[in-house]
Amino acid sequence: MPEILLHQYASSPFAEKIRVCLGIKGLAWGAVDEPVIMPKPELIALTGGYRRIPVMQIGADIYCDSQLIVRELERRFPEPTLFPTGDRGLIQATALWTDRVVFQAAVAIIFGGLGDNVPSAFIKDREALRGGSFDTASMGAAVPHMMGQLRAHVALLAEQLADGRTFLTGERPGLADANSYYNLWFIRSAYPPATTAFDQLPHIGDWLERVRAIGHGERAEVSREAALDIAHKSEPLAGTIATQDAKHAGKQVTIAADDYGRDQVCGVLVGSSEHHISVRREDPIAGQVVVHFPRIGYSIDS
């Protein structure tokens, strides 16, 4: 059984980011396929309420959000690095651009373009996730503007590649490539007509093909039931708590995203740093697990 389990589904753009990172590192991992829409009972048993994809599981440690998954992969499996030129902080900060600004443009283009072809069950699910409207008609009206915005964003990548480099930071692939690739992969996969926004930009097509050719590492299929059994039989890692969180140490807290998908996760604070927050919780199916969240984009309340 692979040590790394990735709870994912094939069409998830954020899962694709992590799959590319696994490919860069050449890691073996288990794909635990989750439903695209709720309910997701096995995933919720592990996370305590967090429903977004992907989630990485290593034993009884559950890592939520792609930004923290990247950090944990690099910590546990440092070579080959996702930061071949260093610049760790700067490159990780690019996720705030790709995961928010560029991703929102991609969502509007894809679902605005698909329009009435988007299943009603999917719309209802995403409205529950967002806590607001998922209006494909409004997205459709915004498509011309968003196509222009997307082209301008991708033109920055073309500018970076203009000196003939193989990948965005040099001759070796890294997180900058995975971050910048997945939204374009998402558009190509979900709504190919929109690739006209970037296909004619110089260097982009060849770079996309080079990133695609990296692959996804060594993948095996793992059932959701098997993943739960692994969690139940494992012991989570111990942690330390940062000074700024000392008042919450050993106490019940609530963690929630501050953008969308704000489902609260409750547990005892057992670890934190400038980069993460960890809570221990008990589940009748999954057993004792520690659920880890990134610090950026998440709130902690007592």
Model-predicted segments: where are they?
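Short linear motifs at secondary-structure transitions and domain/linker junctions
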Residues: 29-40, 154-157, 228-232, 253-256
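Short, hydrophobic secondary-structure boundary micro-motifs
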Residues: 82-85, 168-170, 220-221
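GST-like domain detector, emphasizing the conserved glutathione-binding G-site
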Residues: 1-129, 136-137, 266-270, 277-302
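Conserved RNA-binding domains used in RNP assembly and mRNA/RNA metabolism
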Residues: 219-302
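Charged, low-complexity, helix-prone segments enriched in Lys/Glu/Asp/Gln
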Residues: 91, 95, 126, 146, ...
